[in-house]
Amino acid sequence: IEVLLGGGDGSLAFVPNDFSIAKGEKIVFKNNAGFPHNVVFDEDEIPSGVDASKISMDENDLLNAAGETYEVALTEAGTYSFYCAPHQGAGMVGKVTVN
């Protein structure tokens, strides 16, 4: 599944921001707008036993240009919350359910 970082209208959002995938399915997060964004999974809102640092970008790493991507495959079933570190305060958050 492809998830856009930044709405086509310039909004600070993940599109889609709530979705489901199969276990092991690849998520491609793609910068849509050319603003600096990243993808960080919330260590308190992922299945227990999953290491957030292994599935997240470093909070200081950014996808700066439109078209840049970050890919991750989630192998444990459950619900994962994620956010864009620079824009979390603006509501740039999302959730994925792994079946």
Curated annotation (Swiss-Prot):
CDD domains attached to this UniProt entry: Plastocyanin
Cell compartment(s), UniProt: Plastid, Chloroplast thylakoid membrane
Names of required cofactors: Cu(2+)
Membrane topology: Peripheral membrane protein
Function: Participates in electron transfer between P700 and the cytochrome b6-f complex in photosystem I.
Family affiliation: Belongs to the plastocyanin family.
Name of this chain's protein: Plastocyanin
